[in-house]
């Protein structure tokens, strides 16, 4: 998935199961700090990331688990810098 720097995006995580699975979001295999206001897990389980920068690029994974097991789905996020008029002038 490719997005522009400065934007926000939702990484989808559609899960179902019984008992209801718990969702954990990871980046590069490490749980994301949900105390950081940059990240919000929506009621659907999707991860919303605000204020994207190229440093946010990487592999994110949605992990769903319950007492019967767990499953993980990775998604690659690529954040591209925005071209500005100043950038274009500098390239001449």
PLM segments and residue spans:
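Flexible inter-domain hinge/linker segments at boundaries of tandem extracellular adhesion modules
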Residues: 1-5, 20, 26-36, 40-45, ...
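Conserved Ig-like domain signature around the intradomain disulfide
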Residues: 9-11, 21, 56-64, 73
């Amino acid at each position: 998935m490719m997005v522009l720097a400065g934007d926000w995006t939702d990484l989808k995580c559609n899960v179902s199961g019984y008992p209801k699975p718990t969702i954990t979001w990871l980046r590069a295999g490490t749980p994301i700090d949900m105390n950081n206001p940059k990240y919000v897990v929506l009621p659907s389980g999707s991860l919303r990331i605000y204020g994207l920068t190229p440093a946010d690029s990487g592999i994110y994974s949605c992990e769903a688990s319950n007492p019967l097991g767990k499953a993980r789905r990775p998604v690659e996020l690529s954040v591209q810098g925005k071209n500005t008029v100043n950038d274009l002038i500098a390239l001449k």
